[in-house]
Swiss-Prot record:
Residues that bear Cysteine methyl ester: C87
Predominant localisation class: membrane
GO biological process terms on file: G protein-coupled receptor signaling pathway; pheromone-dependent signal transduction involved in conjugation with cellular fusion
Description of how the protein assembles with itself and partners: G proteins are composed of 3 units, alpha, beta and gamma.
Entries under InterPro entries matching the protein: G-protein_gamma-like_dom, GGL_sf, Ste18_fungal
Protein keywords: Lipoprotein, Membrane, Methylation, Palmitate, Prenylation, Transducer
Keyword Coiled coil: no
Family: Belongs to the G protein gamma family.
Membrane topology: Peripheral membrane protein
S-farnesyl cysteine-type lipidated residues: C87
A GO molecular-function descriptor: G-protein beta-subunit binding
Protein name as it appears in the record: Guanine nucleotide-binding protein subunit gamma
Listed GO CC annotations: heterotrimeric G-protein complex
């Protein structure tokens, strides 16, 4: 019966050590304050164009539309016609 409390104490010690390791890892993680995060978001939104807000950035030029898929469709059709294989790997 003398071993049972020792085993329980050993299990408790192991759990505490695991918790300490988790807390050390969390403490070592790089942190950013809320004000710095907000400044980073403001900087990103002011330097990257978002055409979903045309009041701010205007409308994109026809050739500069990043959401236009006609170029991709034309290239796919050409590459499909040139090969005799049944599949195209991209």
């Amino acid at each position: 019966m003398g071993e049972l409390p020792y085993k329980i104490q050993e299990l408790k010690l192991r759990r505490i050590e695991e918790l300490n390791n988790k807390l050390r890892n969390e403490l070592a993680r790089e942190r950013m304050t809320a004000s710095n995060a907000c400044l980073s978001i403001i900087d990103y939104t002011s330097t990257h164009k978002d055409y979903a807000v045309p009041e701010v950035w205007g409308y994109p030029m026809v050739g500069e539309n990043p959401y236009n898929n006609t170029m991709r469709k034309n290239n796919f059709a050409r590459s499909h016609e040139e090969t005799s294989a049944c599949c195209t790997i991209m």
